[in-house]
Amino acid sequence: MKKLVSSVILALILFGFSWVSPAFAGDAGNGSKVFSANCNACHLGGKNVVNAAKTLNKSDLEKYAMLDLEAIKTQVTNGKGAMPAFGKRLTPDQIEDVATYVLEKAEKGW
């Protein structure tokens, strides 16, 4: 009986952890600095001066399947359309940090 109770408690604990949202991997504080130095010209305040319909707001990131750390890292690294690639200008850690920053700001509404 004791073993059964222990197993049930362990299962509940593990199940509870599965509902916790994952933390972003990068350093948003450093990402803010990277964003200011490299992204602000086009994306000040989460906007987009090239294509006003594709902002960094949560709703637009969701609409274009970009509300995802890996998707943002890929676009920052490789560029897309009018957005230049930053893969040779930024380190992988800087790209991770700026992607984390963008996601955190999008979640908070810029």
From Swiss-Prot:
Q: Name one GO biological process term.
A: photosynthesis
The family database entries (Gene3D superfamilies) matched by this protein are listed as:
Cytochrome c-like domain
**Record-listed heme c binding positions:** 39, 42-43, 83
Pfam families xref list: Cytochrome_CBB3
Q: Which keywords are on file for this protein? A: Electron transport, Heme, Iron, Metal-binding, Photosynthesis, Signal, Thylakoid, Transport
Q: Which GO terms describe its cellular component?
A: plasma membrane-derived thylakoid lumen
Q: What terms describe the molecular function in GO for this protein? A: electron transfer activity; heme binding; iron ion binding
Entry-linked PROSITE patterns: CYTC
Q: How is it modified after translation?
A: Binds 1 heme c group covalently per subunit.
- Cellular location(s): Cellular thylakoid lumen
State the signal peptide span.
1-25
| Function text | Functions as an electron carrier between membrane-bound cytochrome b6-f and photosystem I in oxygenic photosynthesis.
Fill in the subunit field for this protein. Monomer.
The UniProt entry, under HAMAP family, shows:
Cytc_PetJ
Record family assignment: Belongs to the cytochrome c family. PetJ subfamily.
Give the protein name, as stated in the record.
Cytochrome c6
Q: Per the UniProt entry, what species is this protein from, by scientific name?
A: Gloeothece citriformis (strain PCC 7424) (Cyanothece sp. (strain PCC 7424))
Q: Which taxonomic lineage does the organism of this UniProt entry have?
A: Bacteria, Bacillati, Cyanobacteriota, Cyanophyceae, Oscillatoriophycideae
What gene name is given for the protein in this entry? petJ
